[in-house]
């Protein structure tokens, strides 16, 4: 019997592609053949996949971008992609098809439904994306990176967690040093593009902290390129020691050394914080589709691992009070860190592998 084939279908964003890559790496190590089905945009994110993974570029499209003519052509492009996927699957039959969301996953998942192949999806956020919501009732397993996840009626989800980078796993459950009268680290993460509202509010909020906290505080603040100068100046005016950059290459190390993290609540950020196990103040991106960042934060907040502040309620005074509450109560901060760890899923990739192998065994 030859090597079983796993067909991974994923859209062209890092959020879809990273967990897809983690699963691909794990399945290749287990002796599977792996193919990635994506569009031209997704192929640009596939550079980190194992070199043995075949990449099939499919015809697809989205109703979210382009003019009226481009949107009118989307159904025909998707239909062509589905037909091509069916032909490809008949020629080289996958043992399992896994969708990670995004319009480019439609052809492969549709072909899997038509041919009754074992199939599953993985959703990174606490609200299903459009494509995953469409296929959730039509697959054999719905794996959830965030818990709880808002699922269609009658659909059961399995909480696998979101796969994270090796650098994060290396620091999983790193010992937490509670706040005290010694140097403390505060990390501010604005997501992949930084966050203007955090740059507007956080420096002033920190400047309002009690003097005994400020004397020990060291800050690492990720900001948009156009905000770096003014954020740096704001910290300098307040006499605060701060590193302000558009991107920190060593975020896992900084998280492991932090007493408190202030962050957006993108799925990968919440996963990183929970696996390392740190208290957090989360400010969901208000314009996120279906308010999924609030959904991402919900379980973390309910576990008493984080404080949630909606953008509409974010101001220097209230944020300063929340920061002070965490940094002045060592035992409470320690408990938040423990709660964060309990919510994390450092074995997310292994859980996904188990579902794939279970579906493959059922088929045989």
From Swiss-Prot:
Matching entries from Gene3D superfamilies are given as: Glycogen Phosphorylase B
GO cellular component terms, alphabetically, are: plasma membrane
Q: Which Pfam families match?
A: Glyco_tran_28_C (PF04101), Glyco_transf_28 (PF03033)
**Looking at the record's lineage, which domain of life comes first?**
Bacteria
**Sorted alphabetically, which keywords does the UniProt record give?**
Cell cycle, Cell division, Cell inner membrane, Cell membrane, Cell shape, Cell wall biogenesis/degradation, Glycosyltransferase, Membrane, Peptidoglycan synthesis, Transferase
Q: Which SUPFAM superfamilies does this UniProt record tie to the protein?
A: UDP-Glycosyltransferase/glycogen phosphorylase
What the entry lists under InterPro entries is as follows: GlcNAc_MurG (IPR006009), Glyco_trans_28_C (IPR007235), GlycoTrans_28_N (IPR004276)
EC main class here is transferase
This enzyme catalyses: di-trans,octa-cis-undecaprenyl diphospho-N-acetyl-alpha-D-muramoyl-L-alanyl-D-glutamyl-meso-2,6-diaminopimeloyl-D-alanyl-D-alanine + UDP-N-acetyl-alpha-D-glucosamine = di-trans,octa-cis-undecaprenyl diphospho-[N-acetyl-alpha-D-glucosaminyl-(1->4)]-N-acetyl-alpha-D-muramoyl-L-alanyl-D-glutamyl-meso-2,6-diaminopimeloyl-D-alanyl-D-alanine + UDP + H(+)
Q: According to the UniProt entry, where is the signal peptide?
A: none
Q: Which residues are involved in binding UDP-N-acetyl-alpha-D-glucosamine? A: 13-15, 125, 165, 192, 293
State what this protein does.
Answer: Cell wall formation. Catalyzes the transfer of a GlcNAc subunit on undecaprenyl-pyrophosphoryl-MurNAc-pentapeptide (lipid intermediate I) to form undecaprenyl-pyrophosphoryl-MurNAc-(pentapeptide)GlcNAc (lipid intermediate II).
Q: What is this protein called?
A: UDP-N-acetylglucosamine--N-acetylmuramyl-(pentapeptide) pyrophosphoryl-undecaprenol N-acetylglucosamine transferase
């Amino acid at each position: 019997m030859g090597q079983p084939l796993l067909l991974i279908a994923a859209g062209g964003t890092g959020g879809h592609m990273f967990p897809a890559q983690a699963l691909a790496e794990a399945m290749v190590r287990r002796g599977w053949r792996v193919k990635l089905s994506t569009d031209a945009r997704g192929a640009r994110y596939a550079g980190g996949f194992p070199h043995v993974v075949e990449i099939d570029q499919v015809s697809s499209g989205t109703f979210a971008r382009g003019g009226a003519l481009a949107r009118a052509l989307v159904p025909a492009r998707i239909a062509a992609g589905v037909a091509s996927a069916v032909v490809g699957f008949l020629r080289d039959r996958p043992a399992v098809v896994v969708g990670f969301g995004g319009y480019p996953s439609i052809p492969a998942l549709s072909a899997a439904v038509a041919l009754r192949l074992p199939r599953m999806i993985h959703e990174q956020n606490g609200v299903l994306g459009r494509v995953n919501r469409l296929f959730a009732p039509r697959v054999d397993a719905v794996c959830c990176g965030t818990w709880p996840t808002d699922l269609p009626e009658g659909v059961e989800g399995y909480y696998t967690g979101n796969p994270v980078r090796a650098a994060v796993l290396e620091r999983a459950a790193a010992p937490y040093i509670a706040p005290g009268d010694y140097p403390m680290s505060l990390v501010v993460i604005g997501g992949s593009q930084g966050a203007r509202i955090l740059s507007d509010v956080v420096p002033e909020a920190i400047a309002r902290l009690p003097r005994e906290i400020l004397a020990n505080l060291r800050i690492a603040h990720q900001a948009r390129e156009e905000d770096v100068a003014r954020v740096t100046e704001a910290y300098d005016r307040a006499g605060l020691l701060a590193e302000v950059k558009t991107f920190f290459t060593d975020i896992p190390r900084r998280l492991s050394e932090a007493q408190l993290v202030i962050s957006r609540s993108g799925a990968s950020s919440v996963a990183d914080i929970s696996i390392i196990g740190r208290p957090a103040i989360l400010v969901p991106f208000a314009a996120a589709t279906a308010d999924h960042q609030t959904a991402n934060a919900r379980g973390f907040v309910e576990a008493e691992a984080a404080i949630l502040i909606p953008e509409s309620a974010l101001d220097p005074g209230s944020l300063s009070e929340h920061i002070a509450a965490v940094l002045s109560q060592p035992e409470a901060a320690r408990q938040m860190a423990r709660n964060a760890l309990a919510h994390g899923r450092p074995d997310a990739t292994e859980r996904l592998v188990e579902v794939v192998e279970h579906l493959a065994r059922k088929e045989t």
